[in-house]
Design a protein with these regions (language model features):
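N-terminal export signals
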Residues: 1-19
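Short cysteine clusters
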Residues: 192
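Cell wall/extracellular polymer interaction/catalysis modules
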Residues: 19-189, 198-205, 211
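C-terminal functional extensions of proteins
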Residues: 210-217
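Soluble or luminal CAZymes and related metallo-dependent hydrolases
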Residues: 195
Length: 217
């Protein structure tokens, strides 16, 4: 039997294929946000060695004189309200917060009766008084009279004659522990920040150049 073309086509046709539903897989949840822990710097002066007003004024001076204070890892403060026999020069670690205290002298003109307390301050040459305000350390020096020292540049009207007056940080016999034990107080300088000979090498290295020394009364 000969089939017609239409019959042949009908015989070759296949049954329609049922379409399976497409199931979309759920997208994986986004990874949890990783919180970067905030690093809280340690507190400055946890032992509260420095008078709060002195600390706050020194911190302000760092910003006011930022063009000259180029290093902010540590600073040096002098509290002229304290007795000369007490440790009243402070190295403040601005990164770690630690404070180290040293003794330093004031000028004989600031304490003419040698009471151990600085009473008056001046920027005038030949006054032999201490000067207050912000200084920039200017590096290690060497003088014919005082030997190794740290040079200072006065940054304010109250101390901008520091170079002319040769106001420096230097070692002195009258700042040594033996003098203190004998006299009950330190001796007086001509306005310099005199320190014990044993403290000077470390201070000379660490003060360097471009750090703040701030004296206040």
């Amino acid at each position: 039997m000969i089939l017609g073309g239409s019959a042949m086509l009908a015989g070759c046709a296949t049954a329609p294929v049922a379409q399976m539903p497409i199931v979309l897989a759920a997208a994986p949840p986004p990874p949890p946000l990783q919180r970067i822990p905030q690093i809280t710097p340690p507190p400055l002066d946890p032992g509260r060695l420095v008078r709060p007003e002195l600390m706050s004024r020194a911190m302000a001076a760092l910003d006011v004189h930022s063009h000259r204070i180029t290093l902010r890892d540590r600073m040096y403060l002098v509290d002229f309200q304290k007795f000369s026999g007490d440790a009243r020069m402070f190295e403040v670690d601005l990164i770690g917060g630690r404070v180290t205290a040293f003794r330093t002298c004031h000028g004989r003109g600031s304490d003419p009766e040698h009471s151990g307390f600085a009473r008056t301050f001046s920027n005038t040459p030949e006054s032999y008084m201490s000067s207050v305000g912000a200084y920039a350390t200017a590096g290690a020096g060497w003088g014919a009279q005082q030997g190794p020292n740290v040079l200072l540049d006065g940054l304010e009207y109250s101390n901008n004659m520091a170079r002319d007056r040769a106001i420096i940080v230097h070692g002195a016999d009258y700042a040594d522990p033996e003098f203190l034990a004998r006299e009950g107080k330190l001796g007086r300088s001509y306005g310099c920040f005199s320190t014990a000979h044993t403290d000077l090498p470390m201070l000379r290295e660490r003060m360097g150049e471009g750090r703040l020394l701030f004296a206040y009364a």
